[in-house]
Design a protein with these regions (language model features):
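Amphipathic alpha-helical segments enriched in hydrophobic/aromatic residues interleaved with Lys/Arg
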Residues: 1-9, 14, 46
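Short, Lys/Arg-enriched, Trp-marked, Pro/Gly-tolerant hinge/linker segments that flank
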Residues: 2, 17-42, 50, 54-60, ...
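Short helix-to-turn junction characteristic of helix-turn-helix DNA-binding domains
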Residues: 48-52, 100-103
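Residues within helix-turn-helix
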Residues: 59, 70, 106-109, 119-120, ...
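Core residues of bacterial helix-turn-helix
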Residues: 65, 114-115, 126
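Short hydrophobic/aromatic patch on the recognition helix
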Residues: 72-73, 121-122, 126
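Terminal helix-turn-helix DNA-binding modules in bacterial transcription factors
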Residues: 78-119, 139-144
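…primarily DNA-binding HTH/wHTH and HhH modules…
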Residues: 124-144
Length: 144
């Protein structure tokens, strides 16, 4: 009877250790996955900051990162709460606002610099993303 009790305690102790080891291993795997996703996201931001003027497709960035567009989209959303396109739009709008505020370039020149097919396309894009036209933005930021 005592031998059975000892064997049972030994078995339960071994089982408990195995379960804790499994849980610890899963935590390590989860951390490694998070780290990989963070690395992918950081690399995406780096590549996007260098290419947003000419490359606006998720496929381009996914190919550069050697991952699928679907996975890149999931990583961006999970890591930052924003989609790949929202990030690209942020880069473009930030550049547009900077140029409108700090340069004397015409809206046509800015549209060309930002790789829009026409000033009209740029104007529609800017209004959709900034809430006002490029001209209105430029006028609102001028020092009186």
């Amino acid at each position: 009877k005592e031998m059975v009790s000892y064997s049972l305690r030994l078995f339960l102790s071994t089982l408990k250790q195995a379960i804790f080891k499994k849980i610890d291993n899963e935590k390590v795997v989860a951390v490694e996955k998070l780290t990989r996703k963070d690395d992918i996201f950081k690399r995406f931001i780096s590549i996007a900051s260098e290419n947003y003027l000419t490359e606006r497709s998720i496929d381009f960035y996914a190919e550069k990162l050697c991952i699928s567009p679907k996975y890149l989209s999931a990583v961006a959303k999970e890591s930052s709460g924003a989609t790949v396109m929202e990030w690209l739009n942020r880069f473009i709008i930030t550049e547009a606002k900077s140029m409108l505020k700090c340069s004397s370039k015409s809206i046509m020149e800015i549209a060309d610099h930002l790789n829009f097919s026409t000033p009209s396309a740029f104007g529609k894009y800017f209004k959709k993303n900034a809430g006002m036209t490029p001209g209105e933005y430029r006028n609102s930021t001028q020092i009186l």
